Curated annotation (Swiss-Prot):
Alphabetically ordered keywords of this record: Cytoplasm, Endonuclease, Hydrolase, Manganese, Metal-binding, Nuclease
Family (UniProt): Belongs to the RNase HII family.
Record field: catalytic activity: Endonucleolytic cleavage to 5'-phosphomonoester
Example of a GO biological process term: DNA replication, removal of RNA primer
Gene Ontology terms: cellular component: cytoplasm; ribonuclease H2 complex
Segments of skewed composition (Acidic residues): 220-229
Name under which the protein is recorded: Ribonuclease HII
Cellular localisation: Cytoplasm
HAMAP family: RNase_HII_B
Database matches in InterPro entries: RNase_HII, RNase_HII/HIII, RNase_HII/HIII_dom, RNaseH-like_sf, RNaseH_sf
Disulfide bonds: none
Pfam families: RNase_HII
Amino acid sequence: MKPRTSPDSPLLFDTAPLVPDFRLELKARKAGHWPVAGADEAGRGPLAGPVVAAAVILDPKRIPEGLNDSKQLSAQRREELFVQILATATVSIASSSSTRIDETDIRKASLDAMRRAICSLAVPASYVLTDGLDVPPGLDCPGQAVVKGDARSVSIAAASIVAKVTRDRMMARAHNVFPDYGFAAHAGYGTAQHRTGIEKHGPCSLHRMSFRPLRKSEDGPEMDELIPE
């Protein structure tokens, strides 16, 4: 079945306070869709490593307190909520490697990871809320793209936390294999430390060679355009 957006509001651009709650999930439930999953990704901007997506179905009676956009939380708080989410919710995680990103593009790789996370949920979702502008193609249920969804829906916020913590842990492990770049400190983003590592050692197998700064590095160490996100 081809995914579709809500006919009355496919994208949300309203001016409601950016505090995540459960209203969108309850609206979908009222329309006959249950359970509702939230989905988000982490790692679209880095120069190295995978993009990681997560899908989360929260238990309405056991929603962890303090869920929010992962970027608004400290690393310690994300880790705490990550443990709580895994203990109380249905969670699925998928990723697209740097090779996959280079073979397609970051948008397609992100949506593919999100689709696989949603489709791998142990409890099939009846409806999906995704962060951003797109609902992944190839789903078996309808979905709604929510602009700034990780600040509006607790389900999307939970997914953003799971994706972020998972990716950060992956990059910390990658640091043990490729210690010259400082992946544990910046998770692959274009920091000064990362730029220095690329200039000195060249790119490794985790780098996204389709990203313009890395394409330049193949011809010479021109890192001026690497701007941290």
